[in-house]
From Swiss-Prot:
InterPro entries: Ade_phspho_trans, PRibTrfase_dom, PRTase-like, UPRTase/APRTase. The gene is apt. Its EC number is 2.4.2.7. One of its GO terms (cellular component) is cytoplasm. Signal peptide: none annotated. Belongs to the purine/pyrimidine phosphoribosyltransferase family. Keywords: Cytoplasm, Glycosyltransferase, Purine salvage, Transferase. Pathway: Purine metabolism; AMP biosynthesis via salvage pathway; AMP from adenine: step 1/1. It catalyses: AMP + diphosphate = 5-phospho-alpha-D-ribose 1-diphosphate + adenine. NCBIfam families: apt, PRK02304.1-3, PRK02304.1-5. It comes from the Bacteria. CDD domains: PRTases_typeI. It comes from Rhodopseudomonas palustris (strain BisB18). This is Adenine phosphoribosyltransferase.
Length: 199
């Protein structure tokens, strides 16, 4: 059974889209920027202020979901940790299951894993081996895409299970760092609600 926005929100897809476009400018303003965190020269984009404002959070989730309203989505996979918050809300909205993608050693059952590149070195992400069945349609979610290393690893991990990756969704894209372009080059559509310059 596939839910539609009308069933979830009590209004048509067009009405929701008009509403979110009307207040979309608020979303970027609701993200707090913290200079020199976690190190000098970095502008940290803090989405906890967006998540803490009910109107902004609702608008962000509605806007991220909009392209798949009425579509069959089997699972939403969220990257630890803020991807859990956003992904859980999206999974609820599209009436799908939710799959956590976690750092190595955090899941209790048998896992599949994938190594991915960091700025300096590498790390490993995992998910339960039985979390996704071959052919299931999956949306990948995280809060922000910068260099795209973690998202790239997550896509490879999902493909290892036979998932069909419908899209990768983010609240924020830092386009100068090239992550979204890298994901598109992997054949995965990218949806981001806003862009910020720099890193």
């Amino acid at each position: 059974m596939t839910a539609t926005w009308k069933g979830r929100l009590g209004m048509s897809v067009a009405a929701v889209k008009d509403l979110t476009m009307t207040i979309a400018y608020d979303l970027k303003a609701s993200v707090r920027t913290i200079p020199d965190y976690p190190k000098p020269g970095i502008l940290f984009r803090d989405i906890t202020t967006l998540l803490g404002d009910a109107r902004s959070f609702r608008c962000a989730i509605d806007e991220l979901v909009q392209p798949w309203a009425g579509s069959k989505i089997d699972k939403v996979a969220g990257i630890e940790a803020r991807g859990f918050i956003i992904g859980g809300a999206i999974a609820h909205q599209v009436s799908s299951g939710f799959v956590p993608i976690r750092k190595k050693g955090k899941l209790p059952h048998t896992t599949v894993s994938m190594s991915y590149a960091l700025e300096y070195g590498s790390d490993i992400i995992e998910m339960h081996v039985d979390a996704i069945k071959p052919g299931e349609r999956v949306i990948l979610v995280d809060d922000l895409i910068a260099t795209g290393g973690t998202a790239e690893g997550a896509i490879k991990l999902l493909r290892q299970t036979g998932a069909e990756i419908v899209a990768a969704c983010f609240i924020i894209d830092l386009p100068e760092l090239g992550g979204a372009a890298k994901i598109r080059d992997m054949g995965v559509p990218v949806r981001a609600l806003m862009e910020f310059e720099g890193h």
